[in-house]
């Protein structure tokens, strides 16, 4: 399907779990969902995952073999493909820290890319910049006692649940600005509870916009734009969205 659309020069979008993705209510045309492309193989201290595997499933496979590295990332609700695209991270760790090789589809050709030809930065990657379709990735981990691995993952989950809203959301709305959380600026402007239609700034964590009921993609877009404008006016900085917008909103 990707090869066909590429040959026809038609635009298409790749989705995993749709984490951190705002999709137009009017539709977006050609979408390919890869969340069912699954498979995990452990080879010594390396774990090979296909793009549709969730970070939770990869963590569990690693834990089963006493491999450490994915504890901090285990609560990220996205797939491996999506995590690699945006270099997902949490608690000081990023998926790019562990990648040794990825297999991608690009220009209708399947190719393996070694670590020396990869780069990852804060919520960005060569995958995103070049439009690679990730098929699988190899992650190098380290051996550790299983009880210590599980304890760290549990601690991260406890912190996450205490800090983040339970209501439906797209995850963190904005990236950090010069290492300062966007939530700091939003909270400083007393914008918790600020809303547009069914979209509302979480009262639990200012970095999240939640769906309080019936929110549309337009509600979300208008609210996030308003937040950006207010922060720009007050602090003179431009907040960059962490979420990806697909379609016309």
Q: Model-derived features: where do they sit?
A:
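Anion-binding (especially nucleotide phosphate/pyrophosphate-binding) glycine-rich loop
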Residues: 1-80, 84
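Short, basic and Ser/Thr-rich N-terminal targeting/leader segments
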Residues: 8, 15-17, 98, 167-168, ...
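A generic local secondary-structure boundary/capping motif
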Residues: 20-21, 59-62, 70-74, 87-94, ...
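Phosphate/pyrophosphate- and phosphate-bearing ligand-binding catalytic cores of soluble enzymes
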Residues: 21, 105-249
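Structural signature of FAD isoalloxazine-binding scaffolds in flavoprotein oxidoreductases
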Residues: 22-39, 85-115, 129-136
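Residues embedded in well-ordered beta-strands within globular domains across many folds
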Residues: 41, 71, 103, 243-244
